[in-house]
Structure formats: structure tokens, C-alpha cells
């Protein structure tokens, strides 16, 4: 039997509140993270992802208190990211109740951090978050046409997103969270081309993120190679439930829990 596709609500947290915007801007309050986490657990979410969206750009540490309170209330795996810069940061988050930790900007600056975390805690703990966008006409391009960005998509790195995902997996990342900055918050669907290209280069689990707006957007992401599908605003604002997404995946022939 094939491995079940995971459905993962994402909680973008700013100053202890869940927020959602378009392309990480114009943030709108979406509620209390602990309450939302409990709701998604009850709805049958397979995991939760918690991202401190101010931690990297504002150079603030992730809010351990919110992680701790969330972990006390939910019993599904919790991935936490945002502002993770060191092995010590990972250890603090795991002690607070995280099951997996997302690393992004710090790994770009110092790729060996991936191996250090994987060696200390195991590859299964480490999720590499890749915020990628398509290069525009007239801009310097990458081999795949997808560039890794930082600071909520506001800063290009010149790194090819497909190459970076492949390299990170080789260095020890246990999972790739691939977030399309072009699609983020638009509700226009996942970037299927980018998913397909990354899937061709990595064997570790791949999480599709950015662009979910309708129940019909999820099965094509799985067909493009995603092992898990992540969404935020469609869940937070009640447009879709986790169960509806699982029904659509099941109808398309995917195994779900």
C-alpha cells in the first residue's frame, strides 16, 4: 500500500497570533494558535506546521511559549520553523514540544548546519524550508528558472531552488518544504512545475506549500510529486476543512489516513 498523503495546516505566527497575508505581506489576524491547533487536530490533520513569520526578518527568536502551549494541546506531529539558526535553537524547540524543526535562512548562509542538526538529532527531525520564486524576464536567471529567496521572498539569493533542495537532501535534510512565493496567498493553486522539478531530484518527502485556494488544487500537487500538502488561509478562514481535502485526495486515488 502506498504511503498516506499528509494534510498539514500551517500556522504563520506573529507576536503570538496566527496571521495570513499575500506573499507574506498585508498580514491579517486569523486567531489564536493554540485554539486553531486544537481545531485542526480534531478535524483530522496529520501534522501541523508552525512558522514564526517575524523571527527571521525581525531577527527575533521563535516564541517557545506558543510552541509549548500548542504541544500540550495537540498530539499530532508539530513542525516549528522561523529564526532557527543553530543546533541549540533546534534543541530548545524540541524540548518545548516540537517533533520536527524547519530551517531556512541559516542553512543558506551556512549549509553545514544541515549536517550538524541531522547528525545530532537525526535527519527525520530536520525540515528544510525553501521559499522559491520564478525569475522574471530581464533578471539573472538560474538553471531551473526558480530562485531561492529569503526574508519573506523580499531578497533573492541567486541560488537555484531545485539544486538547493537536492543539495540539502544530500547534506541530511529529512524533508523538503517547498513554498512558492509567487503562489503564496493567491489561492490560485500550487506551482506544479516547481514541484515536478524538485521531485525529480530528491527522494526525501516533499511538502507542497503556497497557493492552495480550492479543494481541486490538492490532488494535482500530489500527482506532481508531493508527499504532503500544506495550506493556511483556506483552513483558518473556514473555506475548507481538513476532511474535505482528504475526501478529494481519496477520490483522486491517493491513500489518506
Swiss-Prot record:
Q: Name one GO molecular function term.
A: imidazoleglycerol-phosphate synthase activity
> Which compartments does it reside in?
Cytoplasm
The answer on whether this UniProt entry bears the keyword Amino-acid biosynthesis reads yes
Gene3D superfamilies tied to this protein: Aldolase class I
Enzyme class at the top of the EC tree: lyase
Single GO biological process annotation from the record: L-histidine biosynthetic process
Example GO CC term: the record gives: cytoplasm
**Name of the protein:** Imidazole glycerol phosphate synthase subunit HisF
Give the source species.
Kineococcus radiotolerans (strain ATCC BAA-149 / DSM 14245 / SRS30216)
Q: Which gene encodes it?
A: hisF
Amino acid at each position: 500500500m502506498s504511503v498516506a498523503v499528509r494534510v498539514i495546516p500551517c500556522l504563520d505566527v506573529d507576536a503570538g497570533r496566527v496571521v495570513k497575508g499575500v506573499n507574506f505581506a498585508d498580514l491579517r489576524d486569523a486567531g489564536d494558535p493554540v485554539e486553531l491547533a486544537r481545531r485542526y487536530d480534531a478535524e483530522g490533520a496529520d501534522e501541523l506546521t508552525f512558522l514564526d513569520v517575524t523571527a527571521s526578518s525581525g531577527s527575533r527568536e521563535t516564541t517557545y511559549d506558543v510552541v509549548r502551549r500548542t504541544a500540550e494541546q495537540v498530539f499530532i506531529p508539530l513542525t516549528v520553523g522561523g529564526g532557527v539558526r543553530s543546533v541549540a535553537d533546534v534543541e530548545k524547540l524540541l524540548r518545548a514540544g516540537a517533533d520536527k524543526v524547519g530551517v531556512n535562512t541559516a542553512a543558506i548562509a551556512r549549509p553545514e548546519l544541515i549536517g550538524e542538526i541531522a547528525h545530532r538529532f537525526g535527519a527525520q527531525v530536520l525540515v528544510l524550508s525553501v521559499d522559491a520564486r520564478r525569475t522574471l524576464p530581464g533578471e539573472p536567471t538560474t538553471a531551473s528558472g526558480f530562485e531561492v529567496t529569503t526574508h519573506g521572498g523580499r531578497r533573492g539569493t541567486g541560488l537555484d531552488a531545485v539544486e538547493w533542495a537536492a543539495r540539502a537532501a544530500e547534506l541530511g535534510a529529512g524533508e523538503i518544504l517547498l513554498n512558492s512565493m509567487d503562489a503564496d496567498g493567491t489561492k490560485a493553486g500550487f506551482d506544479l512545475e516547481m514541484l515536478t522539478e524538485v521531485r525529480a531530484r530528491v527522494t526525501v518527502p516533499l511538502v507542497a506549500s503556497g497557493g492552495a485556494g480550492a479543494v481541486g488544487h490538492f490532488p494535482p500537487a500530489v500527482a506532481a510529486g508531493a508527499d504532503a500538502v500544506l495550506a493556511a488561509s483556506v483552513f483558518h478562514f473556514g473555506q475548507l476543512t481538513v476532511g474535505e481535502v482528504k475526501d478529494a485526495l481519496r477520490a483522486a486515488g491517493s491513500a489518506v489516513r
